[in-house]
Amino acid sequence: MAITDWHENDRPREKLLKFGAPHLSDAELLAIFLRVGVKGKSAVELAQDLLDHFGSLERLLNADEAAFCEAKGLGQAKYVQLKAVLEMSRRHFESGLKKGEALTQPEKVARLLQHHIGHQSREIFGLVLLDQQNQFIQFVPLFTGTINQATVHIREVLKTVLDHHAAAVILAHNHPSGDPTPSQSDRDLTHQIQQGLQLIETRCLDHIILGDHGRWYSFTQQGIL
C-alpha cells in the first residue's frame, strides 16, 4: 500500500507536522529524508530495510561513502544531502556554545564530540579548546590511529593550545570498540598531558572518551581529574 493511501495520522510528513518530530520512529524520519521508496516498497518500508541493513540509524548516518552508496535506495546524491544536513546540525549546535555559556558539563561536551568523532572506525584524539571563562573556542582533531591505538605527541598538544590562545582544554577521543572505559594507557596519557599543560599554565578540565550508543566516560565525573 502506498503511503498516500495510509490514514493521514500515519503518514510520516503529516504525523510530524501534527505531533512533532520526536513522535516519529527512526524509519519514519528516514522515510521523510528518502522522500520516495523503490518498486514494491514504500519509503517507510525502504527506510526500515536500510536500518536493518546498517544495524541502526547511527551507523547509517555515519557510514562512509562507499557503504552508503551501495545500499539500495541510496546513492551519491543522498550521501551529499545527508552530509550537508549533518554539517548544518553541527554548526547549529556549536553556534549555541559560542553565546557566552561555560562548557563544563560532561553531557554537553559528549554531545559536541558526537558531531565530530562519534562512531568513527579509527581512534581519533582531539582537544576541546576553551577560553578563560571556559567558553567554547573550537574542537581540534589532532591524531588518528588504528582501531586500537592513537599516537599522541604532547608537543603538538601544547602547540595547538598556544596557537589558539586557549586557557583550558578538555581532552577527547573515541573508542571504536564501543566501550568507553579508559585503559591504563589512557590514564597514563591523561596524566602526562596534564603535567605538560601545567608548564604553560593551561587547565585540563576533563578527558571525555566516547563509546557507542551514546555512551561516554568522563575522567572528571569519575574523580580521576
Swiss-Prot record:
Protein name, entry field: UPF0758 protein Tcr_1917
Binding site for Zn(2+): 173, 175, 186
One GO molecular-function entry: metallopeptidase activity
Regions that span the bilayer: none
UniProt family annotation: Belongs to the UPF0758 family.
Motif JAMM motif mapped to chain: 173-186
Keywords: Hydrolase, Metal-binding, Metalloprotease, Protease, Zinc
GO terms of biological process kind: proteolysis
Signal peptide residue numbers: none
